[in-house]
Every structure is written in structure tokens, then in C-alpha cells.
Regions:
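Short glycine-rich, basic-tinged beta-strand/loop micro-motifs
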Residues: 38-47, 83-99
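Short strand-loop junctions, especially beta-strand C-caps/beta-turns
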Residues: 80, 96-100, 132-134
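Long, contiguous juxta-domain segments that are non-catalytic but functionally important
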Residues: 7-8, 45-74
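Acidic, proline/glycine-rich low-complexity IDRs
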Residues: 1-5, 85-87, 102-134
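Short edge beta-strands and adjacent turn/loop segments
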Residues: 33, 67-91
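N-terminal presequence-like segments and adjacent domain-start helices
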Residues: 24-56
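Terminal low-complexity, intrinsically disordered regions
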Residues: 1-35
Length: 134
């Protein structure tokens, strides 16, 4: 029997700043990097370390995206400046697709209605899921 030990999500409330940063970095490297491609990896990692509450949500999002889009698709994480965001920066989860715009938007709409809108408050305005046409 093989046991796999998964790191616990980082918690700023129970750890010092340095411990929380190290825990977030471990979580990013072991749980998030294998699931996503990072555009400007340093910027994405820094953003995730500053917003560790997104890390478990990203793991769950990957599973849900695979249910609605091609399972072999590797979503992309990119930090984008959004003038409507409180600090102007937001993490975008971009789902690459070769679908027609109608089909891709239909899939995204189903993902939104059946999962994303229910968990959206957990993202605290720091994460958006969208499609990217290939």
C-alpha cells in the first residue's frame, strides 16, 4: 500500500508570515504547478503566495474544468491588471480551446452555473475563469 501525503493548504492565521510563505510555495510547487501552465511564472507564484486562499480553489477548479472541457487541456494561469479589481491585479484561469466560440461559451456558461458561481465568493474578487481560443 502506498500513502501519498498532500501538503495542507497554507493558513496565514496559524502560521508566521515566513511559515505561511513557505507553506504557500510548497503548495504551489506540489499541487498547482503540475495542473497549470504559468504565464510569467514568477509573477503568478508571487501573486499566489500573496493570496494563498486561492490555492485549494485552483486544485478544485482544475477538476471541474476537466469535466466541462477536454480533460487533457492544461489551463493557463496569468496575472492580469484589471482596473475594476481592488488592487488592480487578478488571476485569470484561461482554458485553451479549439471549440467554436458558441461551443466554448456554452461550456463556460455550464461551468459557471453548475459550480463557479457557487464558489466565487471564496475567490474574494482575485480570480476569474475564461476561455482562450487557440
Amino acid at each position: 500500500m502506498t500513502f501519498v501525503v498532500k501538503p495542507q493548504p497554507p493558513s496565514k492565521t496559524t502560521q508566521s508570515g515566513q511559515e505561511a510563505g513557505a507553506a504557500a510555495l510548497l503548495w504551489i510547487r506540489s499541487m498547482v504547478e503540475p495542473l497549470y501552465d504559468f504565464r510569467r511564472p514568477r509573477e503568478v507564484s508571487t501573486f499566489l503566495q500573496a493570496h494563498p486562499f486561492l490555492l485549494p480553489l485552483l486544485v478544485e477548479a482544475h477538476e471541474k474544468i476537466a469535466e466541462y472541457f477536454e480533460p487533457s487541456t492544461k489551463p493557463i494561469l496569468e496575472v492580469i491588471t484589471d482596473p475594476e479589481s481592488e488592487d488592480g491585479r487578478e488571476l485569470f484561469v484561461l482554458v485553451p480551446t479549439h471549440d467554436t466560440p458558441e461551443e466554448a461559451l456554452s461550456r463556460l456558461e455550464r461551468l459557471d452555473q453548475e459550480w463557479w458561481l457557487d464558489v466565487l465568493p471564496q475567490a474574494l474578487g482575485k480570480m476569474t475563469i475564461d476561455v482562450e481560443y487557440c
